[in-house]
Amino acid sequence: MSLLLLVVSALHILILVLLFVATLDKSWWTLPDKESLNLWYDCTWNTTTQTWACSNVSENGWLKAVQALMVLSLILCCLSFILFMFQLYTMRRGGLFYATGLCQLCTSAAVFSGALIYAIHTEEILAKHPSGGSFGYCFALAWVAFPLALVSGTVYIHLRKRE
């Protein structure tokens, strides 16, 4: 049982790390000329000063929805981890981790919705930028976090506390 709890906790921490990097790092979309777009800033590599020059992203409504969903997924994932620890130490033997599992399933839904909106509305979000480019690693990390959170939520729902 302790090995299962360790694996579930490690999976949850992995999901948290993936969500933090996907939400806060600077590569949701990369353009050929070393320009990188994330949820918060539009960054261009300045070759003369060897630094990143960043400005705020556009006020696109779809991008605001993606920002809100990714932040919501982070909050829900943190909440479910805190709830899991609370339930682990206070719940009676034989109890199920329904609340934790439900929070993780909501995390999964929020990540899925955010990444899907970004994928579908990329042209509208990037309307002021030159054509070309590809999805960055932060976008891929969001898609990796989605099934992991889904599996984690399902495991929590079926997990019973044992002595």
UniProtKB/Swiss-Prot annotation:
Question: Where primarily located?
Answer: membrane
The UniProt entry's coiled-coil ranges are none
Q: What does this protein do?
A: Probably involved in cell proliferation and cell-cell interactions.
Name the PROSITE patterns on file: PMP22_1, PMP22_2
| Glycosylation site list | 46, 56
One of the protein's GO biological processes: bleb assembly
Cell location: Membrane
Q: What family is reported? A: Belongs to the PMP-22/EMP/MP20 family.
Q: Where does the chain cross the membrane?
A: 4-24, 66-86, 100-120, 139-159
Signal peptide start-end: none
Query: What cystine pairs are annotated?
Result: none
Membrane topology, as annotated, equals: Multi-pass membrane protein
Q: Which UniProt keywords apply?
A: Glycoprotein, Membrane, Transmembrane, Transmembrane helix
- Annotated protein name in UniProt: Epithelial membrane protein 3
Question: Cellular component GO terms, alphabetically?
Answer: plasma membrane
